[in-house]
Regions:
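Cationic, low-complexity basic patches in intrinsically disordered or flexible, solvent-exposed regions
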Residues: 2, 8, 25
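Compositionally biased low-complexity segments enriched in histidine and/or tyrosine
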Residues: 3-4, 19
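Compositionally biased low-complexity segments, especially N-terminal hydrophobic helices
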Residues: 9-10, 32
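Conserved alpha/beta enzyme-core scaffold
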Residues: 35, 40-429
Length: 429
């Protein structure tokens, strides 16, 4: 059907769609760019509820998705904690959340069950104390858990921008798995925040898809990775910069080392970005036209990302910026999609690496620290890319002076990237 529609003229397609009401045609990142997608949705003014009223729909035994990263709806979560006395065994599932989510506190253990798909600082203690669960899963596979019914969602708690004149809100700087969550959840509660950037790509959701609206003008979470960059990270950044050719497509993971790499690329040309996460380090390279995405095959001239975490400067920069495409993570992190771009350089960090090349990136011994995330998605995608380079980067020692390149991984350590997938290991030496 897609093939037939693509062959038809826009006028014919419009005549087919113009009378359809209350139907939303969501463009998929995997549909070719020349595929015509029209929207014909009745828009009505939204009405706001109190958080207490909106959350009253949640009942015991429900599974609730929580929007993540800088878009964490902390205002809604704080109110949900107040409703704990009427609730039992409500499962909350998410990837990385920021700030105090309240519901993970010990006193709510019987009311709320945390099921993390990635372990962030906000829930690390709860996971390691056994009060919360962790599912080790590739980031690219998470949307299918929602879509295939393995993790059916009763409710989604999201944070969005106010609607535009056509009734569209934006999922802001965290589209990642949120796109799949809002597509499958039975009931959607939106925290509407004027501070949320309106981003391009797969971020739009129409108000007709949202069941409850709660207004909150809280500032978004910020993280300044550049402030944490030390001399060892800067040296690693310089070494990695030597491995990056002009015209490469970059994936930069989470942490200080990716930011240090970006600081070392001022003499490069025609770089592209296809990454699950972007931070402030890309802004200067954009303004110098070092990053222009001109050599990419997939979404040329656009920076492709799943989410952004950084300072307000970054959030203002991506706001209504058509040079950025915030897309569904099952597209962004698909190794086969990644590999279609030329010279993909995937830069990811590790906690510990043994001398055979096994990479522990999610735990310190048996203590869970983060998660699987998208490391393997991009390590594999870069390896399949023509001229690609999968890179694991870490300082040679911890802040306590303990070695991180070791004969054997600590007992209980998790292997995120196998020795068979490792191509480059970079330290400050």
């Amino acid at each position: 059907k897609q093939e037939n529609i693509q062959k038809s003229s826009s006028s014919v397609f419009y005549s087919l769609c113009k009378n359809i009401k209350n139907t939303e045609y969501i463009s998929s990142s995997k549909i070719p760019c020349n595929f015509l997608v029209l929207h014909s949705i009745m828009y009505k003014e939204i009405s706001y509820q109190s958080a207490e009223e909106a959350l009253s729909i949640i009942k015991s035994g429900d599974r609730v998705y929580v929007h993540g990263s800088a878009m964490t709806p902390n205002f809604l979560l704080a109110e949900l904690a107040k409703q704990a006395p009427r609730l039992q065994n409500v499962e909350l599932t998410f990837i990385s959340v920021l700030g105090d989510i309240v519901v993970d506190r010990p006193e709510y253990e019987n009311n709320f069950h945390i099921n993390c798909l990635f372990v962030s600082d906000s829930v690390r203690h709860a996971v390691n104390e056994g009060r919360a669960d962790f599912v080790p899963v590739f980031l690219s596979d998470i949307p299918d858990l929602f879509k295939n019914g393995q993790l059916p969602l009763d409710v989604a708690l999201i944070q969005v921008s106010p609607p535009d004149k056509h009734g569209y809100c934006s999922l802001g700087i965290s589209v990642d798995i949120a796109r799949a969550a809002v597509s499958t959840a039975k009931h959607i509660i939106a925290q509407v925040n004027p501070n949320v950037p309106r981003t391009h790509g797969d971020s739009m959701i129409h108000t007709n898809r949202i069941h409850s609206f709660v207004y909150s003008a809280h500032a978004l979470h910020v993280v300044d990775y550049s402030a944490k960059v030390g001399k060892e990270e800067l040296q690693i950044g310089k070494f990695i910069a030597e491995l990056i050719d002009d015209g490469s497509t970059l994936q930069t993971g989470i942490g200080t080392i990716p930011d240090a790499v970006l600081k070392s690329l001022n003499n490069h040309k025609n770089l592209g970005i296809h990454t699950e996460m972007c931070s402030d380090g890309i802004i200067d390279l954009f303004e110098k036209d070092i990053i222009n995405n001109s050599k990419k095959i997939i979404h040329p001239y656009k920076t492709v990302t799943g989410f952004a975490v950084g300072t307000k400067k970054l959030y203002d920069y991506v706001d209504d910026n058509p040079a950025f495409a915030f897309l569904d993570i099952d597209f962004v992190n698909d190794p086969h999609i990644i590999s279609k771009n030329p010279k993909v350089v995937a830069i990811n960090s590790a906690i510990e690496v043994d001398i055979t090349g096994q990479v522990c990136a999610d735990s310190i011994g048996s203590k869970l620290f983060s998660g699987i995330g998208g490391q393997m998605d991009f390590i594999r995608g870069a390896a399949l890319s023509q001229g690609g380079k999968p890179i694991i980067a870490l300082t040679s020692r911890t802040k306590k002076g303990e070695p991180r390149i070791v004969p054997f991984l600590k007992q209980g350590a998790g292997v995120v990237t196998t020795r068979g997938h490792v191509h480059y290991i970079v330290t400050e030496f």
